[in-house]
Design a protein with these regions (language model features):
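Bacterial N-terminal signal peptides
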Residues: 2-13
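N-terminal hydrophobic targeting/anchoring segments and the immediately downstream early-domain regions
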Residues: 14-185, 237, 241-414
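Alpha-helical elements of the RecA-like P-loop NTPase motor core of helicases
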Residues: 43, 216-220, 229
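Active-site-adjacent beta->alpha loops and helix N-cap segments on the catalytic face
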Residues: 170-179, 189-190, 214-224
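Short, contiguous, pocket-lining structural segments
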Residues: 186-193, 209-214, 246
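Substrate-binding cleft of carbohydrate-active enzyme catalytic domains
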Residues: 196-210, 216-220, 250-256, 333
């Protein structure tokens, strides 16, 4: 025994150290609070009379309750988006969309519940039912029709973020979507009224969303805000050179502000090859869409929406979908440039015509966790990215609001 002991010890010393087990990505995903900050499903509720309890093919939509359960989605910010190309009564259309969200939640109360605070999100996920926390964000400041009273009304109805612009420059903020269009009157960022909008959003506790805005508007908003900002559905410009994406300088500015960038899943925002091909077909695609609009000018809204969506998807399908790796690269890049506390997910489900391979609907969200875990992201990091970072920002905006409301008069009667 004494003679063989040194040999045994030598063999043990020569043996490789046991490998650290890889995190169980699916268990991590299941245990996470998954928050997505952008889905355009309300358009389907209103224009298609779509019921979220109806299981639909992925070709027809990215979201239904079955897919939501499969993807372990815990909270969704449904987009209240008013297309300025098809509607002129912006606030009226926004109210219709808000009503449609409430109606779906009422209809499926066993599985969905309206949420108005960070605490409400957490409460919705308690117990065996684990309901989907339903929140709303207005996409495009034109919806308030230059009226802070309408902004306050949206807050009272449950809107908890507003994107300062959509792809159109409004009366008080420049958009990235038309910043190079010389026919559009621009403001060089935010006007004085636009700065008042940001201040009032801070006071209300409504998160300031800087997706879609021009670079100058972005920096103006960060100079004015007293609360963290969000980019509800934007990706990294260093990887995909779209003005809708954020430069590394902007990513670092969001980190300094303690905000969060929620990565968009649209193929043209996450893959440079796809973006170039998509832009090359834009003139022909727009001509086809305009011809369809003229053809359907007397059709009902549901038909117009359905046919427009079908045609856009047909054109996008002519371009090969990028790999899922492209999306993961954007999350990884933002985590490295801004920090792991400043990145999340903002899918743009039901609002885009192409998603990366393997990501066909909300049911496929666990694949994102799989890929990030394979790159070495820990359980704690994944929980932050999947929802923890957004929840932190939401709570901080609520805290700032409490301070401002305590020191400023209530404008409710104005």
């Amino acid at each position: 025994m004494i003679a063989v002991a040194p040999v045994v010890f030598a063999l043990l010393a020569a043996s490789p150290a046991p490998k650290t087990p890889k995190p169980d990505a699916r268990e991590i995903h299941t245990s996470a609070l998954v928050i997505d900050t952008h889905a355009d499903t309300p358009q389907r509720f209103l224009d298609e009379r779509f019921d979220i309890g109806t299981v639909t093919p992925v070709a027809d939509g990215h979201m239904d309750l079955q897919k939501i359960r499969a993807g372990n989605l815990g909270a969704e910010f449904f987009s209240i988006w008013v297309d300025p190309n098809h509607h002129t009564r912006y606030a009226h259309r926004a109210l219709q969309l808000i009503d449609a969200v409430y109606e779906q939640t009422r209809r499926h109360a066993a599985e969905m519940t309206m949420a108005f605070s960070a605490a409400d999100i957490l409460a919705a996920r308690q117990g065996p039912s684990k309901k989907l926390a339903v929140l709303m964000g207005v996409e495009g400041g034109h919806a308030i029709e230059d009226d802070l009273g309408i902004l306050r009304d949206f807050y009272r109805l449950g809107v908890r973020y507003m994107t300062l612009t959509w792809s159109n420059t409004n009366e008080w903020a420049d958009s990235s979507g038309d910043i190079k269009d010389t026919k559009i009157a621009h403001h060089n960022g935010l006007t004085d009224f636009g700065k008042d909008v940001v201040r009032e959003m801070n006071r209300l506790g409504m998160m300031v969303d800087i997706s879609h805005v021009s670079d100058k508007t972005f920096f103006d908003a960060l100079n004015v805000t007293r609360a963290p900002v969000i980019a509800s559905h934007s990706s990294a410009r260093a990887l995909t050179n779209s003005p809708r994406n954020m430069t590394d300088e902007m990513l670092k500015a969001v980190a300094k502000n303690n905000g969060v960038v929620q990565v968009n899943f649209f193929s043209a925002f996450i893959d440079e090859g796809y973006r170039k091909a998509f832009n090359e077909q834009t003139p022909a695609r727009n001509a086809a869409l305009n011809a369809l609009k003229a053809k359907l000018k007397d059709a009902d809204p549901a038909t117009q929406y359905r046919e427009r969506d079908r045609l856009q998807k047909e054109w996008s399908a002519r371009i090969p979908r990028p790999p899922l790796k492209s999306l993961i690269d954007h999350i990884d890049h933002i985590a490295k440039v801004a920090g792991e506390d400043h990145v999340g997910i903002g899918s743009d489900f039901d609002g885009v015509s192409s998603l990366p391979e393997g990501l066909d609907s909300v049911a496929d969200l666990p694949k994102i966790t799989d890929e990030l875990a394979a790159r070495g992201y820990s359980r704690e990091q994944l929980h932050k990215i999947l929802g923890g970072n957004l929840l932190r920002v939401f709570k901080e905006c609520e805290r700032v609001s409490e301070q401002l409301r305590a020191s400023a008069p209530d404008h409710a009667s104005h």
